[in-house]
A protein has these predicted regions:
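N-terminal membrane-proximal hinge/A-helix region immediately C-terminal to the signal-anchor transmembrane segment
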Residues: 1-95, 110, 114-122, 157-158, ...
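Cytochrome P450 heme-thiolate monooxygenase catalytic core
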Residues: 1-4, 68-77, 92, 108-265
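Conserved cytochrome P450 K-helix E-x-x-R motif and the immediately C-terminal K′/meander segment
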Residues: 15-34, 207, 211, 290-324, ...
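Cytochrome P450 heme-thiolate "Cys pocket" and heme-binding signature region
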Residues: 95, 102, 312, 324, ...
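Cytochrome P450 catalytic-core helices
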Residues: 143, 260-287, 382-400
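Cytochrome P450 fold signature focused on the C-terminal beta-domain
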Residues: 216, 220-226, 283-293, 306-326, ...
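Conserved cytochrome P450 K-helix/beta-meander segment immediately N-terminal to the heme-binding cysteine loop
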Residues: 336-363
Length: 412
């Protein structure tokens, strides 16, 4: 069995294009090779196959036996820890997913609405609305406060103030493919270089998290509290065991980083799209003034289609995959190229146009709209993120009527 055709260029050239111009790189590959192709990055023992046909994606995600692709642990484990939900597989992953799911769905999730509104309105009060300012950093501030309040129950205090700064540093070093590439390249320099400095900052963040865990364990009202850390401390696996401090640290770091940066970026992209499409912005404002949220939901769905924050969500095949004319052997690393699926003209007419109305009548197909991945590894906080985006967008657009921008030029 042979893999789909491989992208042009050396492994180093491919990874540099991926790091600096990922969408242009994927679009060129689609035009040259079609719905599936392979890439080869330095340091990985085999190519990775990228797919974009929904039928192939469904076949991949429906099989629970598939594992994590190569490279995920290399990038994430030093930061999130080996027990992180994002790095667990099989029964270990499902057990942790069951314990961590409740706060991010249903009534428990909706109970955070007032807190979210308070946080975003306090943030708006600090904005210099008489001049231009970057929105992404302001969305990071909002979503970080929300996740801190959800995880710890409070967001004040000197320890959490220091933790904010530490998390910002960790994100700066790990959030983009470019920074991940630099980190991978400099880890070999023991005792010096950017990676050694980053490790010191990460240890300082760990000290703060362990101090919060220790303080929480001493709380006499632990069973009455509704914050996520208290819930995780009280949770028990099927064998009756509780999470250790090390595992709590890993899950907290996962929630604090993954639980706010992706939402902040999605919000920033949504504002970017709205401010480049005045008619859509005007229609959204009018619908919110009328107390109707259908267009708001459609706007978020369309934004996540055009600007998915996570580009890949793959698997290592545990068994042979047959789909979309492909036959791939067990052991192959396969990932949906999310943006390519989202911009397929056969699925979405005018695929590069921002048209929220395309989602007013019908929800997207499960395997043609995958900003949160899919299958048993679909993002734990997907519902929470969309809920948070609705509240933040509604509050800002209701209060701020002078939002504008100077340019809509794009570079992908």
């Amino acid at each position: 069995m042979t893999l789909p055709p491989e992208a042009r260029g050396t492994p180093l050239g491919q990874v540099l294009r991926w790091a600096f111009r990922p969408l242009a790189f994927m679009q060129e590959c689609r035009e040259r090779y079609g719905d599936s192709f392979s890439v080869r990055f330095p340091g990985f023992e085999r190519p990775m196959v990228l797919i974009s046909d929904p039928a192939a994606i469904k076949a991949l995600y429906m099989e629970r036996a598939h594992g994590l692709p190569a490279g995920r642990n290399i990038v994430l484990e030093p930061v999130l820890g080996s027990r992180s939900l994002l790095l667990q597989e099989g029964a270990e992953h499902l057990a942790r997913r069951r314990l961590m799911l409740p706060p991010f769905h249903g009534e428990r999730m909706r109970s955070y609405e007032e807190t979210m509104r308070e946080i975003v309105n306090a943030e708006i009060d600090s904005w210099p609305l008489d001049r231009e300012f970057p929105i992404h950093s302001r969305m990071q501030a909002v979503t970080l406060e929300i996740i801190l309040r959800a995880v710890f129950g409070v967001s004040e205090g000197p320890r959490l103030d220091r933790l904010r700064g530490m998390l910002a540093t960790v994100l700066q070093e790990t959030a983009s493919p470019r920074s991940q590439l630099i980190g991978l390249a400099t880890r070999r320099f023991e005792g010096g270089g950017p990676w050694a400095k980053f490790e010191g900052q990460l240890r300082a963040a760990d000290d703060l998290l362990y101090a919060e865990i220790a303080e929480h364990r001493e709380r006499p009202d632990l069973e009455e509290r509704d914050d996520i850390l208290s819930m995780l401390m009280l949770a028990r696996f099927e064998d009756g065991e509780a999470m250790s401090d090390t595992e709590l640290r890993d899950q907290l770091m996962t929630l604090l980083l993954a639980g706010h940066e992706t939402t902040a970026t999605a919000l920033a992209w949504t504002f970017d799209l709205l401010l480049c499409h005045q008619r859509a912005l005007d229609r959204l404002r009018a619908s919110l003034e009328g107390g109707e949220e259908g267009y708001l939901r459609a706007t978020i769905t369309e934004s996540l289609r055009l600007r998915p924050v996570v580009p890949l969500a793959g698997r290592r095949l545990a068994k042979k995959l047959n789909a979309d004319g492909l036959t791939l052997p067990a052991g192959t690393d396969v990932t949906p190229a999310i943006w390519l699926t989202h911009t397929c003209a056969d699925i979405y007419p005018e695929p590069f146009a921002f048209k929220p109305e395309r989602f007013l009548e019908d929800d997207p197909d499960t395997y043609a709209w995958i900003p949160f991945g899919g299958g048993v590894r679909r993002c734990l906080g997907a519902s929470f993120a969309e809920f948070e985006m609705r509240i933040v967008l509604r509050e800002i657009l209701t209060r701020c009527d002078q939002i504008g921008r100077a340019s809509c030029r794009e570079r992908v």
